[in-house]
Curated annotation (Swiss-Prot):
This is NAD(P)H-quinone oxidoreductase subunit I, chloroplastic. It comes from the Eukaryota. One of its GO terms (cellular component) is chloroplast thylakoid membrane. Gene3D superfamilies: 3.30.70.3270. [4Fe-4S] cluster 2 binds at residues 74, 104, 107, 110. [4Fe-4S] cluster 1 binds at residues 64, 67, 70, 114. InterPro entries: 4Fe4S_Fe-S-bd (IPR017896), 4Fe4S_Fe_S_CS (IPR017900), NADH_quinone_OxRdtase_chainI (IPR010226), NDHI (IPR004497). Keywords: 4Fe-4S, Chloroplast, Iron, Iron-sulfur, Membrane, Metal-binding, NAD, NADP, Plastid, Plastoquinone, Quinone, Repeat, Thylakoid, Translocase. The lineage of its organism: Eukaryota, Viridiplantae, Streptophyta, Embryophyta, Tracheophyta. Its EC number is 7.1.1.-. GO terms for biological process: photosynthesis, light reaction. The keyword Cytoplasm does not apply. It holds the Pfam family Fer4_10. SUPFAM superfamilies: 4Fe-4S ferredoxins.
Length: 180
């Protein structure tokens, strides 16, 4: 009977210890609920992108001739081009086009070498998601034009600030060799 009593006592001690550990974890979890988020948007204003900025790729399905030049010039063979050969018109018919921006290095080779100019770089650079599979864009997602950064109020106030007007006057007064 004595070994059975010690078994009950050790079981009770283990149960109390487990409840205490669960309680400590719960207290730590509840103490973090009132904290501010760790990540914040930085910079606070959206950046003004340059004219030749290489952001998300825009794709025009109607212009594509499924030549696969974009796949050949891509250093990582990234664009996936599905097509079938139409015998009656003797041309390739594009079925599907997709790019995984989780893998893309934004080199711009596909845009530069496209013979029909169906690819172009946009000024959209905020592509972060919680799931990496959401970065795989098909032809429908690629054909959507991004929301223009120029419509943003913070960008407009920066461009209309007195400092930017002074900089514009300086740029008009100073000429370089390329301006002539």
């Amino acid at each position: 009977m004595f070994p059975m009593l010690t078994g009950f006592i050790s079981y009770g001690q283990q149960t109390i210890r487990a409840a205490r550990y669960i309680g400590q974890g719960l207290i730590i979890t509840l103490s973090h609920t009132n904290r501010l988020p760790i990540t914040i948007h930085y910079p606070y204003e959206k950046s003004i992108t340059s004219e030749r900025f290489r952001g998300r790729i825009h794709f025009e399905f109607d212009k594509c001739i499924a030549c696969e030049v974009c796949v050949r010039v891509c250093p990582i063979d990234l664009p996936l081009v599905d097509w079938k050969f139409e015998k009656d018109i003797k041309r390739k018919q594009l079925l599907n086009y997709s790019i995984d921006f989780g893998v893309c290095i934004f080199c711009g080779n596909c845009v530069e070498y496209c013979p029909t100019n169906c690819l172009s770089m946009t000024e959209e650079y905020e592509l972060s998601t919680y799931d990496r599979h959401e970065l795989n864009y098909n032809q429908i997602a690629l054909s959507r034009l991004p929301i223009s950064i120029m419509g943003d109020y913070t960008i407009q106030t920066i461009r209309n600030s007195p400092q930017s007007k002074i900089d514009e006057e300086k740029s008009w007064n100073s000429r370089t060799i390329t301006d002539y």
